[in-house]
A protein has these predicted regions:
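A helix-coil-helix interface module used to build multimeric assemblies
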Residues: 1-123
Length: 125
């Protein structure tokens, strides 16, 4: 997004930081489901959540992406830097599209809601 043409609230929703935070939540939700089915060691998701939530560094992820040339691999590599061994259970059984498409859908909802509230505020009855 071009900042000078964007509402600050929308710039925040579409920022790299927000995108990567949403990716983490998606990965953790799947990891928790895998734990419930006995496919992942119990506590893996909680450990990753504790060690990585609020600590993601978008600049570091982009640095890794410049090397790997793959956005999701760069993200997962950075999460592993933060969380260590339990992060290896993230992305199990998933494709990059599973994360990207779900996150895109999850971004449209708050962005659309913000725009609707804004547009409705412009209507004078």
């Amino acid at each position: 997004m071009i900042d000078r043409y964007s509402r600050p609230e929308l710039t925040a929703i579409w920022s790299d930081g927000a995108r990567f935070a949403l990716w983490l939540e998606i990965e953790l939700a799947v990891c928790e489901a895998m734990e419930a089915r006995g496919r992942v060691p119990t506590g893996s998701a909680a450990t990753v959540r504790e060690r990585a939530t609020g600590k993601l560094d978008p600049k570091r992820i982009l640095e890794i992406e410049a090397i790997t040339r793959h956005d999701v691999i760069a993200f997962l590599t950075h999460v592993e830097e933060l969380a260590g061994e339990p992060a290896r259970w993230l992305h199990l059984g998933m494709t990059s599209s599973d994360v990207l498409d779900t996150a895109l859908d999850g971004t449209f909802i708050p962005a659309g809601a913000h725009l609707m509230v804004h547009w409705l505020s412009l209507i004078h009855i």
